[in-house]
Amino acid sequence: MTLNLCVLTPNRTVWDSKVNEIILSTNNGQIGVLPDHASIATAVDIGILRIRLNDQWLTMALMGGFARIGNNEITVLVNDAEKSSDIDSQEAQQTLEIAEANLRKAEGKRQKIEANLALRRARTRVETINAISELVGVPE
């Protein structure tokens, strides 16, 4: 049995295909979703979406939004999303370093909040690339 996963941003459909399982970062922690999961709607945090497709794990960086799960259908609506295969590791690392520097330089509450969000996004992109090696040990 499979799930139909659809990941949408305001500008495009990032994923629309059947999957075996996902692990989703929510505002309350990570949740695993298998076929026949209970119906829920949840906020999606800036974090990594892990997708099991047959015997292979794939990852995607999600930049916050909402998810609806029910009847073996998962719809994820996010501000932005990138598959790990689409992320340039050097560019992601440079963006992370810039975000860290900007957070150190931030003055005032608003600048610090914006810099912290940029850092979380940059860190998630780097972690998404590195997450595949971690998934090798995930039991099926």
Curated annotation (Swiss-Prot):
Q: GO terms for CC?
A: chloroplast thylakoid membrane; proton-transporting ATP synthase complex
Q: Which residues cross the membrane?
A: none
What subcellular compartments does it reside in? Plastid, Chloroplast thylakoid membrane
Record keywords, A-Z: ATP synthesis, CF(1), Chloroplast, Hydrogen ion transport, Ion transport, Membrane, Plastid, Thylakoid, Transport
**How is the protein disposed in the membrane?**
Peripheral membrane protein
In which domain of life is the source organism classified?
Eukaryota
> Which Gene Ontology MF annotations are present?
ATP binding; proton-transporting ATP synthase activity, rotational mechanism
Matching Gene3D superfamilies: 6.10.140.480, F0F1 ATP synthase delta/epsilon subunit, N-terminal (2.60.15.10)
InterPro entries named among the record's database cross-references: ATP_synth_F1_dsu/esu, ATP_synth_F1_dsu/esu_N, ATP_synth_F1_esu_C, ATPsynth_dsu/esu_N
Q: Which family does it belong to?
A: Belongs to the ATPase epsilon chain family.
What NCBIfam families is this protein classified in? ATP_synt_epsi
Q: What biological function has been recorded for the protein in this entry?
A: Produces ATP from ADP in the presence of a proton gradient across the membrane.
Quaternary arrangement and interactors, per the entry?
A: F-type ATPases have 2 components, CF(1) - the catalytic core - and CF(0) - the membrane proton channel. CF(1) has five subunits: alpha(3), beta(3), gamma(1), delta(1), epsilon(1). CF(0) has three main subunits: a, b and c.
> Can you say what this protein is called?
ATP synthase epsilon chain, chloroplastic
Organism equals Panax ginseng
Q: Name the encoding gene, please.
A: atpE
